[in-house]
From Swiss-Prot:
The gene is terA. Transmembrane segments: none annotated. The keyword Chaperone does not apply. Not yet known. This is Tellurium resistance protein TerA. It comes from Alcaligenes sp.
Length: 339
């Protein structure tokens, strides 16, 4: 761990410095040990403060004096006391960067435990009052849905809060590495996020940028697209929000991604969908085993099971929304649309 109290790691490949409100981490990727697969950049707030009390928060990647990429965190209404701003990670021999901007309401302790670091609790008072039984400890490790573990259930709650679903991918074929693999191609793939939504009363709708069917968060169908990344330049990809306060009104949500523009090449997109539910570990499903003759992937399904959320991995590929509709029996009527 490298921070203001320990400004260098043991081999000097990562160092920290700060001036005013600016903090700088210098990372020498060539000196990192071979077993280092990921470097995470985080921020925590002191006391009872949350990140929404900050005036500005962003992360910028530089090489020399050249700014390569940057991402700004939307702070309004955020309740987290600790955030993962982004990660530099090793994949297929290259170093890549992903902007995350997700975190934990509990601050440093759950953040540290997420990365496997134990943080001691505050010392108890000398004469503490009797405490109620502690709730079962929730594991904050990321959950990956796979063939071997295709589903997970989240315990029933009256209010799940704002459920956020993120689609992120590599836009172009480039030359590999941190720049080439992520940002260096003019032949970017426009990968779009979408959802089929069925409410408890049987009402069904499609939420996607295609056809400007962006949905609605506060009223039916309680699912809404957060814009459309047509340029491929947004570091955090595309987002779909589900109103967890109204989960009782939702029967199921089918999450999918489709290639609106570009030649299908699922293995090169390295696509991943991540589900973020407040106070729950992130749940991710990767777009693997892609069929390059098909432009749409049915990724996962969220099912209301007596008030709980069951997340099921699907990972099936189709030629389009209409073919997927027939496969799962939704019964929509389709016509050609555009963005």
């Amino acid at each position: 761990m490298v921070f203001y109290g320990q400004p260098r790691n043991e081999d000097g490949s990562i160092s920290f410095s700060a001036e005013g409100t600016n903090s700088v981490f210098t990372v020498d990727l060539s000196r990192l040990k071979p077993d280092v697969q990921k470097v995470a950049f985080t921020v925590t707030c002191d006391g009872s403060h949350t990140v929404s009390s900050l005036n500005h928060l962003s992360i910028q990647i530089e090489s020399g004096n050249t700014s390569l990429i940057s991402g700004q965190v939307e702070l309004s209404g955020r309740q987290e006391a600790a955030l993962i701003l982004g990660e530099v990670y090793r994949r297929n021999g290259d170093w890549k960067f992903v902007f995350i901007a997700q975190g934990f309401n509990g601050g440093l302790k759950p953040l540290a435990e997420y990365y496997g670091v134990n943080v001691a609790d505050e010392p108890a008072p000398v004469t503490p009052p009797p405490a109620p039984p502690a709730p079962p400890k929730v594991s904050l490790s990321k959950v990956s849905l796979t063939k071997e573990k295709p589903a997970i259930s989240l315990a029933k709650k009256a209010n799940f809060g704002e459920i956020r679903i993120n689609l992120n991918w590599h836009r172009g074929s480039g030359s590999g590495g941190l720049l080439g693999g992520m940002f260096g191609s003019n032949k970017a793939i426009d990968l779009d996020l979408g959802a089929f939504v069925e409410l408890a009363d049987g009402y069904k709708s499609v939420v996607q940028a295609l056809g400007n069917a962006f949905g609605n968060y506060h009223s039916e169908p309680y699912v809404q697209m957060q814009g459309d990344d047509r340029t491929g330049e947004a570091l955090d990809g595309e987002w779909l929000h589900i109103n967890g306060r109204e989960w009782k009104e939702i029967r199921q949500v089918l999450i999918y991604a489709f290639i609106y523009q570009g030649v299908p090449s699922w293995d090169k997109t390295d696509g991943v969908v991540t589900l973020h539910v407040p106070e729950q570990p992130p749940i991710e499903s990767r777009l693997t085993e892609g069929d390059n003759k098909r432009t749409l992937c049915a990724i996962a399904r969220l099912v209301n099971e007596n008030g709980s959320i069951r997340v099921e991995r699907i990972n099936q590929y189709f030629r389009g929304q209409e073919e997927m509709d027939r496969a799962f029996g939704w019964g929509f009527r389709w016509s050609r649309g555009s963005k």
